[in-house]
């Protein structure tokens, strides 16, 4: 099993695998998004306290989850890259960062839209909001640093350090509502207690979360293929690819 993981860690092998996966994942993401939006915005009942305004939860919560999950995935690939010096690890980390930054921005934006009618202001110095903003800046810092260093291997190592050190912010985001007295509500879904929302609300949120997962996997597979061609362009196997050979013709 371990040897099979190392087999797919080779850029040449992963290129083919990602090419087979990303169209199916993209189609799945589209289907799940349409289903989630239908359940969340058309079928789910209005909230007893927040009325119709709560429906932004079907976007806000899934993108917030993914902004944290993606950063942890970046830290995982960063550790793998520093430990085993695998070429694919740096590419995976770079491919994840733009999507993570997008989700962090959407989390902050939808949170502001939700917070305005609930709290009467677009922004408060809340522990969860502030730590999510820090996460967004960590993504931007990672992308800026790796883009500023010309040597790819050095850029990957420098970026890996940001990804690993910055990962400490993720549990701070998650536990902030428990550690401090914040305006932000607690966890929308908990594994230790029964759901407090209507079943249709829960299903809408879970469908959207699965859609965000599928989208992330699809776009990362697509982006990694581009990075592989860019970094391995001098190898014989890349030169032999139909898409590369056709572009040169």
Predicted regions span which residues?
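Polytopic transmembrane helical bundles with strong interfacial aromatic enrichment
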Residues: 2-249
């Amino acid at each position: 099993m371990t040897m099979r993981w190392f087999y797919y860690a080779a850029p040449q092998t992963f290129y083919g695998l990602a090419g087979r996966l990303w169209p199916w994942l993209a189609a799945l993401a589209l289907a799940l998004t349409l289903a989630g939006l239908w359940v969340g915005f058309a079928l789910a009942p209005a909230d007893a306290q927040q009325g119709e305004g709560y429906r932004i939860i079907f976007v806000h919560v899934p993108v917030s989850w993914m902004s944290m999950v993606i950063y942890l995935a970046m830290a995982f690939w960063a550790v793998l890259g520093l430990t085993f010096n695998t070429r694919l690890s740096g590419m995976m980390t770079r491919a994840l960062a733009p999507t993570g930054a997008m989700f962090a921005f959407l989390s902050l934006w939808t949170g502001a839209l939700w917070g305005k009618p609930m709290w009467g202001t677009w922004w408060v110095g809340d522990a969860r909001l502030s730590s999510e903003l820090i996460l967004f800046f960590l993504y931007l810092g990672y992308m800026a640093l790796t883009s500023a260093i010309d040597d790819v291997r050095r850029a990957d190592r420098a970026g890996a350090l940001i990804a690993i050190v910055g990962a400490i912010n993720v549990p701070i985001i998650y536990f902030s509502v428990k550690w401090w007295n914040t305006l932000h509500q607690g966890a929308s879904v908990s594994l230790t207690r029964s759901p407090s929302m209507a079943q249709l609300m829960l299903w809408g949120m879970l469908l959207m979360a699965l859609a965000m997962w599928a989208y992330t996997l699809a776009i990362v597979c697509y982006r990694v293929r581009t990075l592989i061609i860019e970094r391995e362009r001098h190898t014989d196997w890349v030169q032999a690819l139909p898409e590369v050979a056709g572009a040169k013709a």
